[in-house]
Every structure is written in structure tokens, then in C-alpha cells.
Amino acid sequence: MGAVHGVCYGMVGDNLPSRSDVVQLYKSRNIHAMRIYNPDQEALTALRGSGIFLILDVGGVDEVRRLGRDPSYAAGWVRSNVQAYYPDVLIRYIAVGNEVPAGDTGIILLAMQNVHNALASANLSSSIKVSTAVRFDVITNSFPPSSGVFRDPSGLVPIARFLDSTGAPFLANVYPYFAYRDDRGQNIRLNYATLQPGTTVRDNGNGLTYTSLFDAMVDSIYAALEKAGTPNVRVVVSESGWPSAGGFGASVENARNYNQGLIDHIRSGTPKRPGAIETYIFAMFNENRKPGDEVERNFGLFFPNKQPVYPTTFPN
């Protein structure tokens, strides 16, 4: 399908536009894919006939556990949230959990299997793939990229094998920003972190040269998938972004450089895997009710009044 460039639509704010206004904003800005974090019925209704591809998250950990424990609950979930909307809503993937703690990987796999089986019973499993979105720190030894390996192979390898057997992608939330912030600029250069030219890093393990931390992070995931025996599983970057305020390295200039750089870059792929990378920028809006550090409320491309925080251009 070429380079899919999506934006994550978080709703953790009390001043955000209506769901239908948000869908129109996506269309007017040439944003062709969306991720939502639960099956919000208003959003799904607004997406009908929009032509926008969708990653649909099932919701929080409690929902993942219910889906894992009860195949009939999973079948009902698919009926209510998928069959009721597809194909008017172009659901592409179902994310069973977002950054679920490592101790729950067993129930994640059961939930993924139950949702996949429910889709198969509805003759939808070839069109809609089931995955889970993980934090980047499921990878250890991520530098050099060729050394990447799963931190918890007993939990992640069975998930990778399930993805391989069903033709589903590995969804990973990849944030060079947090690596740069935690490093405090000691070893990671800002231009390398924000996809700007000027820094090259050679991986002596695979002979490849890297000009961005994003590429190095993605390729370390591919290295881990290869070591797990699943080299054909494709990585989809289910979140990536840079905050415009609220913490070390967070500024409008850095956020624009990173996010516009990412939009422009995903068409070319990584040194290890040339070709388009399906990528979802986090996030559409600054969300004023998001918990955590101040940066968490400043990842948006847009203010709640639909005005851009800084200019970005998405290709047609």
C-alpha cells in the first residue's frame, strides 16, 4: 500500500473537538490512517465511509484479560466493535493491549488468539490482523541494532510466532525522544535523534550505517524478530512522536523537525529493511487530562481548537 502515515487520536482531554470534526481534520490534512485506544462508538460512527485506515485498540489491561479468559466474550466484542462497522470503517489491525506489563504477556497471547478466532469465524481474519502494541524496552541490547534481542523471550517469542502464523505485524511504540531525554545529550546527538542530517553511526555487526536513532531502534526490533525465528514479521510503528513543551529537549522546533522528518522519511525505510514503514505519529492533539509528566500533555500536532502547534505537511 505504499507509505502509510497515520496519527494516533487520543481522547484524554476535556476540550477536544467532536469526533466528526476530528475525522474531517484528518481528511483535510491528508492523514490517511488513525489509531484509537478503545472502541469509541462515536469515533467509529464518524469514521464510516471516510476511507481512513484504522488501528483499533481493545482498551485497557482489564479488557485484555476478559478477552483472554473468555472466547465467547471475544466473539461478542468482535460482533459489536468490528462486524458492526467493517467494511464501512477500514479496520486494519486490532491492538490487543498497549504497553501491557511484561507479567501479562501470557494473557495477551490468549486474548489475541481469541480475537483472531472470532474474526476467522466471521470470515474477517484475512482482512483484519490481530497484534499487540509494545514499548520499545521489550528490546534489550538495542545498540548496535544488530544486537537487539527480546528482553523476555518466554513472553515475546510466542507472540512473534503467532504474528508470523497469522500474517500480522509487530506493533511497536518507538520514541527516540525518551532515549534522548534520558541520555541528557551526553551520547545521543540532537540531530541524530530528530532525523536531521549530520551524524552517522556504523553497526559493525551488520556493516550498515545509520543516520537516525529511529532507524536504529526499528532495526533492533527486526534483529530481535530474526533471533526469535520470525524474520518475516513486519514492524509497524504504532506510536512515535516528539513533545513541543514540558521537558528536556521538548520544543516546537525539535518536535517539528522530528515529526516532519518522520513523515518524509517513512517512505524510504531503514538500512536493514528498505521500503515504506507504516508509522503512526503520536498524537493528533495536546491532551490536557493525560497523566504523567508535562511532556505527556504536549505531544499533539494540533491544539484542541484544531490549530496546528507547528506546521506539518502530509503527502497526498
UniProtKB/Swiss-Prot annotation:
GO BP field: carbohydrate metabolic process; defense response
UniProt superkingdom: Eukaryota
Known function: May provide a degree of protection against microbial invasion of germinated barley grain through its ability to degrade fungal cell wall polysaccharides.
Pfam families listed in its UniProt record: Glyco_hydro_17
SUPFAM superfamilies, A to Z: (Trans)glycosidases
One Gene Ontology MF term: glucan endo-1,3-beta-D-glucosidase activity
Organism taxonomic ancestry: Eukaryota, Viridiplantae, Streptophyta, Embryophyta, Tracheophyta
InterPro entries for this protein: Glyco_hydro_17, Glyco_hydro_17_plant, Glycoside_hydrolase_SF
Tagged with keyword Hydrolase: yes
Catalytic activity: Hydrolysis of (1->3)-beta-D-glucosidic linkages in (1->3)-beta-D-glucans
EC number of this enzyme: 3.2.1.39
Classification via Gene3D superfamilies: Glycosidases
Localization in the cell: Cytoplasm
UniProt-annotated catalytic positions: E99, E239
Keyword Hydrolase belongs to the record: yes
Cellular component annotations (GO), alphabetically ordered: cytoplasm
Homology family: Belongs to the glycosyl hydrolase 17 family.
Keyword set, alphabetical order: Cytoplasm, Glycosidase, Hydrolase, Plant defense
Protein name: Glucan endo-1,3-beta-glucosidase GV
